[in-house]
A protein has these predicted regions:
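Gly/Ser-rich helix-loop-strand patches that form or flank binding pockets
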Residues: 20-22, 27-29, 110, 118-167
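Short, flexible loop segments at the rims of nucleotide/cofactor-binding pockets, characterized by
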Residues: 12, 107-112, 137-140, 179-180
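Residues at secondary-structure transition points
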Residues: 14, 68, 72, 115-119, ...
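Short boundary motifs at domain starts and secondary-structure transition points
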Residues: 98-103, 164-170
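Small/aliphatic-rich secondary-structure junction motif
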Residues: 1-62, 154-157, 168-216
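Structural beta-alpha unit
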Residues: 1, 15, 41-44, 52, ...
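A short acidic, glycine-rich active-site loop
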Residues: 58-75
Length: 216
């Protein structure tokens, strides 16, 4: 068992570089494909939020401003991706994740979609073996916390939160939080590839946190 398809939602550029480096390290471990996804705000979603009492012209102006800002942000994210791919010349650029696995070695791709970020990211994550999410505390990327929440609770897939700075090593020492629940069992099953290759694994448990189920 291995993680062959990784998803990295790039919400902005503040924590994007560290997230890209972390995700690439994971992809190298598993010879996986890394798919970078940026979700643009759909200007049409702004109209219902505009509130009553606004004229049609004001709503159109608001939608135009949203579209412009969304486009500029998408451009910055794409530039970040292109710079990163250029620095790592050994990567193979793929047109999409569906054909990437036919290419040997680590591959990488980029896609932009429009919609509600938390919905798109959670839904797309279900198509991948694991999601790598940028650190949510970067000031520029306020929406990254929404993406993280969506992936954690709505994707059903394992999630790796990238640190503020790319680590020198990853996955060598693993901690398991166990309380006997079905959720903890599912988390352990999803983490088995990491557990098999880890140098050390520690199980954390607490009588106060224990639920009905097997003990650690």
């Amino acid at each position: 068992m291995a993680y062959r398809r990784l998803l990295l939602p790039l919400t902005g550029t503040a924590a994007g570089e560290a997230a890209l480096a972390t995700a690439l390290d994971v992809a190298r471990i598993w010879s996986a494909h890394l798919h970078c996804l940026h979700v643009r705000v759909d200007a049409r979603d702004v109209a219902p939020l505009a509130g009553e009492g606004l004229s049609g012209a004001m709503i159109e102006e608001m939608m135009a401003a949203t579209e412009r800002e969304s486009g500029e942000r998408a451009g910055r994210v794409r530039q970040l991706f292109d710079r990163f791919a250029a620095i790592h010349g050994d990567l193979t650029l793929a047109s999409d994740p569906n054909t990437a696995l036919k290419t040997p070695g680590v591959t990488i791709s980029f896609e932009t979609m429009a919609g509600r970020e938390e919905d798109v990211v959670a839904q797309q994550s279900r198509l991948f073996d694991m999601a790598v999410v940028p650190h949510p505390e970067a000031e520029e990327d306020v929406s990254s916390s929404d993406a993280l929440h969506a992936v954690l609770f709505d994707s059903g897939r394992p999630v790796l939160i990238a640190p503020r700075e790319a680590p020198k090593t990853i996955g060598t020492r693993v901690a398991i939080a166990w309380n006997g629940s079905a959720e903890s069992a599912a988390a352990v099953a999803a983490a088995l590839p990491w557990l098999h290759r880890a140098q050390a694994v520690r199980i954390l448990c607490s009588d106060e946190y224990q639920r009905r189920g097997p003990l650690a």
